[in-house]
Amino acid sequence: MVGFKATDVPPTATVKFLGAGTAACIADLITFPLDTAKVRLQIQGESQGLVRTAASAQYRGVLGTILTMVRTEGPRSLYNGLVAGLQRQMSFASVRIGLYDSVKQFYTKGSEHAGIGSRLLAGSTTGALAVAVAQPTDVVKVRFQAQARAGGGRRYQSTVEAYKTIAREEGIRGLWKGTSPNVARNAIVNCAELVTYDLIKDTLLKANLMTDDLPCHFTSAFGAGFCTTVIASPVDVVKTRYMNSALGQYHSAGHCALTMLRKEGPRAFYKGFMPSFLRLGSWNVVMFVTYEQLKRALMAAYQSREAPF
C-alpha cells in the first residue's frame, strides 16, 4: 500500500468539501505557469483587449510562451493572478468536486450503483453551481494572467484593486462577465473530468487491474485530464476571450465565438491546446492524488481523535 490506507468509515461531506479545495490549491500552485501560458496563447490574435497583453510578443508553443514571458516580463509574470486563482479554487473546487459524491447520491436516492446518467447530471449540477459562486475570482484571475508586466502597462496592481476597478468601471455584472460560457464550460469539464475519473477508477478496480492506491489514482486522473481537454477546449477559449474582452467588444459569448470563427478559422478554438492538456493533465494528477490522500488522512485523524482510550 502506497500513501495513507483507506479507512473503514467513508469520508464525510465536510472532509470532501475541505479536501477538494485544499487539493485544488496545491495543484494550482504547481501548475499555474502552464495555465498562464494557456491564457496568453488563447488570447493571441485578438485585435482588441481590455488589458495590455504584450501584443508585440509572439508566443509559440508552451515552452516558447513561458520563455518569452520570463525574458520580457520576468519570472513572476508566470504567477500573475495566483491570489485570485487560489481564491477561485478554494471556493470553486470545494463545490464542484467536494459536493459531487453527495449530489450523485441525491440523484440515485442513496444507491451505491450510480449509472452514467446520474454521474453526468451530478457533474453538470456541481459544475454550474460552482461557477455561480466563484465567477468573480475567475474573471480577476484571467485579467491578471492576460495583462503584461513589461512597459508599465499593468491595469491592476493588486487583487483587491482589480475587484474594485471592475465593479466601478463595468458594474457588478462585470464581475460575472462570461458566466454563460463558463457555466457551459464547467458543466462540460465537470462531467468529463469527474465522470471520466470515476469510470476509469471503477473499471480498474472492478477488473482487478489495480488496487485503490496511488497508481490507480494517477492513471485515472491522467486519463480524465486528456478527455477533458479534448472536449472542453473550444468552450474554454471562448470563455477566456470573452472574459478578457473590452466593454462592448463582443455582444455575447456567441458573438465572440462567431468572430473567432470568421477571423481566425476553426483552429482558433483549439489555441493553447498543448498547455491546456499539460496543465489539466498535471493538475488532475496532483489534485486527485492529493484529494484522495487528504480524505484518508483527515478521516484517519478524525477516527483516532474519536477512538476511546
From Swiss-Prot:
It is a multi-pass membrane protein. Residues 1-16, 104-119, 200-217, 295-309 are mitochondrial intermembrane. It comes from the Eukaryota. Pfam families: Mito_carr. Coiled coil: none annotated. Widely expressed. Highest in spleen, lung, white and brown adipose tissues. 4-6 times higher levels are detected in white adipose tissue of ob/ob and db/db mice when compared to lean littermates. Expressed in neurons of the ventromedial nucleus of the hypothalamus (at protein level). Expressed in thymocytes (at protein level). Proton conductance is activated by free long-chain fatty acids and allosterically inhibited by purine nucleotides. Could be constitutively inhibited by GDP. PROSITE patterns: SOLCAR (PS50920). Residues 41-77, 146-173, 243-268 are mitochondrial matrix. GO terms for molecular function: antiporter activity; chloride transmembrane transporter activity; GDP binding; L-aspartate transmembrane transporter activity; malate transmembrane transporter activity; oxaloacetate transmembrane transporter activity; phosphate ion uniporter activity; protein homodimerization activity. Disruption phenotype: Mutant mice are viable, have normal postnatal development and show normal thermogenesis in response to cold and diet. They develop glucose intolerance through reduced insulin sensitivity in peripheral organs. Deficient mice are resistant to infection by intracellular parasite Toxoplasma gondi likely due to increased macrophage ROS production. The chain crosses the membrane at residues 17-40, 78-103, 120-145, 174-199, 218-242, 269-294. The keyword Membrane applies. Changing residue 185 to T: Reduces inhibition by GDP but does not affect long-chain fatty acid transport. Induction: Down-regulated upon macrophage stimulation with LPS. GO terms for biological process: C4-dicarboxylate transport; cellular response to amino acid starvation; cellular response to glucose stimulus; cellular response to insulin stimulus; cellular response to lead ion; glutamine metabolic process; glycolytic process; liver regeneration. GO terms for cellular component: mitochondrial inner membrane; mitochondrial membrane; mitochondrion. Changing residue 241 to S: Reduces proton conductance and long-chain fatty acid transport. Retains normal inhibition by GDP. Solcar repeats lie at residues 11-106, 114-203, 212-297. Keywords: Membrane, Mitochondrion, Mitochondrion inner membrane, Repeat, Transmembrane, Transmembrane helix, Transport. Homotetramer. Adopts an asymmetrical dimer of dimers functional form. Interacts with MICU1 (when methylated); leading to decrease the calcium sensitivity of MICU1. Belongs to the mitochondrial carrier (TC 2.A.29) family. The GDP-binding domain is located within the hydrophilic cavity, with GDP phosphates likely forming salt bridges with the charged residues, Lys-141 and Arg-185. Antiporter that exports dicarboxylate intermediates of the Krebs cycle in exchange for phosphate plus a proton across the inner membrane of mitochondria, a process driven by mitochondrial motive force with an overall impact on glycolysis, glutaminolysis and glutathione-dependent redox balance. Continuous export of oxaloacetate and related four-carbon dicarboxylates from mitochondrial matrix into the cytosol negatively regulates the oxidation of acetyl-CoA substrates via the Krebs cycle lowering the ATP/ADP ratio and reactive oxygen species (ROS) production. This is Dicarboxylate carrier UCP2.
